[in-house]
Amino acid sequence: ACALTAALSGKPVLAEEWGGCTAPPGEPSQTWRWTALAGEREQFMASEEDLAVYVAQVLPRLVAAGATGALLWCFADYDESLHGTPPLTAFRHERHFGLVRPDGTLKPHAEAVRAFAATSPRVRRVDWTGLLDVTPDEYYRAPAEHAVRLYERYLRRGA
């Protein structure tokens, strides 16, 4: 997504509001299902350890893609005293997106961020213009038609 956005805009890209919601500490990855707002809800909840692996894999790839930074969503899980209040009643998974648990301890993916930062990664501009085989105007007229092909092209490039 960063490479495509950079290629279409010709501007640097910041990856923001990414990450994942986690299952309770010590529990494996799982799928939660519940009913809210007259509809069935389903959400994958990564184990804390699995999300740490994911974050550790994504951060260097963002650097390689030329992203100027990465803002994970979000700082801390909601305190349990707030779980019964809107919007957390309908969107249960939103309670658990934090880098920090309600008790103030860091989740493993926060440690993955710390370890990555310790490598002193350098932001570098990557020219993605060669990725496109259509103009931005052509792309935006039919994004679903172009996105899969351009992603496959990106993968063949060896990114």
Regions found by a protein language model. Give the residues of each.
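Residue-level recognition of short, well-ordered coil/turn positions
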Residues: 66-67, 121
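Aromatic side chains
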Residues: 50, 54, 73-75
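The substrate-binding groove and active-site-proximal loops of carbohydrate-active enzymes
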Residues: 1, 37-52, 96-105, 112
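Amphipathic, alpha-helical segments enriched in basic
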Residues: 33, 37, 42-45, 84-88, ...
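Glycoside hydrolase catalytic-domain groove-lining segments
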Residues: 1-39, 56-59, 68, 77
